């Protein structure tokens, strides 16, 4: 589930996201970054653990950064169904640089692109199945599984895919 994951981009978050995707994707590109000079850094998968079961990923407008790397790869490879609403659209890599006086500056150092080369910055990723969260649930602190119409739609999709496979 990448729904609600905000802008927590750090090197270890990218690495963790890529490690998760290496357990799912076929051989190929996971994501790549490109700096202002066009220098490209690729993150790849050997395909040794390709996931072959039904998969649904919940996304929304708070799904950003590493959550979009994950969702973008799943969508580009077609190995799962994105359910929910359009993601945030944060396709940049930022670094925080500490200054001598104790302050810090946040610098954008590169952009990232999905395996198909899609630039999602300020655009987001559209889900395969759009499901708005019920209005009555938007301000609730806790939402049960039974109430969560986006989750219920994802479960329904997985059940349909499972039945089709049998």
Question: Across the structure, where does each feature detected by a protein language model lie?
Answer:
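Short beta-strands and strand-coil junctions in structured, solvent-facing domains, enriched
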Residues: 11, 64-66, 81, 114-115, ...
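Single conserved hydrophobic/aromatic residue that forms the stacking wall/gate
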Residues: 1-9
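Conserved P-loop NTPase
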Residues: 94-97, 105-138
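Short, well-structured beta-strand/strand-turn elements
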Residues: 77-90
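Gly/Ser/Thr-rich loop/hinge elements
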Residues: 13-65, 92-98, 113
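Intrinsically disordered, Ser/Thr/Pro/Gly-rich linkers and terminal tails that flank
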Residues: 12-19, 26, 116-122, 130, ...
